[in-house]
Amino acid sequence: MLVIHRRIAPQALWAAELLLNFEARSKSRLRCFSADGEDVGLFLERGQPPLHDGEFLQAEDGRVVRVCARPEQLLHVTCSNAFELTRAAYHLGNRHVALQVGDGWLRLLDDYVLKAMLEQLGAQTETIEAPFQPEHGAYGGGHHHSRHGDEDFNYPPKLHQFGVRL
């Protein structure tokens, strides 16, 4: 098994390629196969952005591995003007949809419910096969509800008694 722990800078040569869809590129722990069929175990640092097309990894045995975004079924969204495209992006963002943004277009994983919503908003949609590389997000840490890092603001609860004070 090819065991990988490290992301590395771009390289001129590589020994293996991983063809991964967006969901697989988002995982820090993954068992998969190289393009040549070799068993691969990814054990990357948690909390990092998803792997992107063209990124390089280094295996424990020193081999360099190139990540390739596998084409997947996407909705390619266009609108007749910038206002409508911005409105479509707003509604998709409000639903926390992973979104790839281009010059005059949006792309998201194919979903019939979102397609109907977009068409109701006046957008034109087309189903395509292409690699998916959505925006990572403005805050980089992902969406969570943990209280990690709130130690300085961890006050004991108070019992409030409402009514007449004597």
Swiss-Prot record:
HAMAP family: UreE
Assigned GO CC terms: cytoplasm
Residues making up the signal peptide according to the UniProt record: none
Annotated family: Belongs to the UreE family.
Gene designation per UniProt: ureE
Record-given protein name: Urease accessory protein UreE
Coiled coil: none
An annotated GO BP: protein-containing complex assembly
